[in-house]
Amino acid sequence: MARKYFGTDGIRGRVGQFPITPDFMLKLGWAAGMAFRKEGKCRILIGKDTRISGYMFESALEAGLAAAGADVQLLGPMPTPAIAYLTRTFQADAGIVISASHNPHDDNGIKFFSNEGTKLPDDVEAMIEELLDQPMTVVESAGIGKASRINDASGRYIEFCKGSVPSGTSFKGLKIVIDCAHGAAYKVAPSVFRELGAEVRVISAQPDGLNINDGCGSTHIAALQAEVVAQQADLGIAFDGDADRVLMVDQYGAVVDGDELLFIIARDLQERGRLRGGVVGTLMSNLGLELALAELNIPFVRAKVGDRYVIAELLARNWQLGGENSGHLVCFQHTTTGDAIIAALQVLMALKRRGQSLVEARSDLKKCPQVLVNVRLSGAVDPLEHPSVKEACARVTERMAGRGRVLLRKSGTEPLVRVMVEGDEESSVRGYADELAKIVAEVCA
């Protein structure tokens, strides 16, 4: 059954436009409290990224939860994976994240974690949606929930991240630049890498509520590229606003994407006999990743785009490693969800074990040229079902003669159609992508 409010990654939209409004968040808090409350009280953790609207929505959610009889513990600005970890280790009934991830400050959203620090099951989301359509009530005065703050949350998470590498590990002699996207990782990420011995230069770590993801972070990586070269650093690490995505930059300023990072981690695990099963990618994963893993006899399967689908496929197969080329990387040997800091640490450990630079480590993956064009979606027409779009896709696929792929899909978080073309020659791939994007745009006009 189609969900009314929840998308592929929770509830997300423009601040001030339904459902990203204070009154809806009040009702959402109440509905969540009612859904998680079993017999008597329940306890819910709330964390957020650094966007200014987070304070407003935190208060609204807190009030709604209290009205349902739920106690609330506030974490303040924290990476999304930290909230998953703390929900589990504090044995809370659920965790709530206030974030729109890599989106600009005027967007925001809500996502939930179960008591195990995993994505919320579909049946629980369905229960919350059902409650949202019912009248809001308030428990008896004596049963109203209480709110408190957890003051040592950052320190707990920093130690957890450091614990994902072997005891005694030192990155002394490694010079890195970290781009925190003016987001949730601005305090914890520099501390993790510094405490492990690395020389750290930090950029985009002065959040003001409005500058999150603004020309920085994993979606705007040019500033990090320039800083790595200027500082003559060994590599750069870029997080997004809620630190569940990571990309890297090598010493020459070249971007190392999620496919390449996934390959480096997978090869390291296999060489140490620690890789359980294979690797899960997505429909957007580069064909080069699939071929490179095949050379290592590592199984590879593709899930739908979205970390929730990668995670679902990993769980179904009892595998432990998966991710997206956008930088969502899931290392189940350490975490219950995608964690950018921990994924970056696994890459650094792989480099350390092999005695390689990032340039050397990525060289065994030969990526096929891939072009992605985003087309703004407007109107009621579904371009993916339009005859002219289908005919164009078939025509391009035929012209590529089995030497490439065409994929059109709607974004799960933004009003966009993503047009992806992959093949063995960049100029033709670009031409095909532009051709398809033009047709999609005409249909959407």
UniProtKB/Swiss-Prot annotation:
Domain of life per record: Bacteria
Reaction equations catalysed: alpha-D-glucosamine 1-phosphate = D-glucosamine 6-phosphate
Keywords (A to Z) from UniProt: Isomerase, Magnesium, Metal-binding, Phosphoprotein
Signal peptide: none
Its EC number(s): 5.4.2.10
InterPro entries xref list: A-D-PHexomutase_a/b/a-I, A-D-PHexomutase_a/b/a-I/II/III, A-D-PHexomutase_a/b/a-II, A-D-PHexomutase_a/b/a-III, A-D-PHexomutase_C, A-D-PHexomutase_C_sf, A-D-PHexomutase_CS, Alpha-D-phosphohexomutase_SF
Recorded GO CC terms: cytosol
GO process annotations (BP): carbohydrate metabolic process; peptidoglycan biosynthetic process; UDP-N-acetylglucosamine biosynthetic process
Cofactor note: Binds 1 Mg(2+) ion per subunit.
CDD domains registered for this protein in UniProt: GlmM
Modified residues (Phosphoserine): S101
Cofactors that this protein relies on: Mg(2+)
PTM statement from Swiss-Prot or TrEMBL: Activated by phosphorylation.
Keyword Ion transport: no
Pfam families: PGM_PMM_I (PF02878), PGM_PMM_II (PF02879), PGM_PMM_III (PF02880), PGM_PMM_IV (PF00408)
Molecular function terms, GO-annotated: magnesium ion binding; phosphoglucosamine mutase activity; phosphomannomutase activity
Active site (record annotation): S101 (phosphoserine intermediate)
SS bonds (residue pairs): none
Gene3D superfamilies recorded: Alpha-D-Glucose-1,6-Bisphosphate, subunit A, domain 3 (3.40.120.10), Alpha-D-phosphohexomutase, C-terminal domain (3.30.310.50)
Binding site for Mg(2+): S101, D240, D242, D244
Protein family: Belongs to the phosphohexose mutase family.
Main function: Catalyzes the conversion of glucosamine-6-phosphate to glucosamine-1-phosphate.
Protein name: Phosphoglucosamine mutase
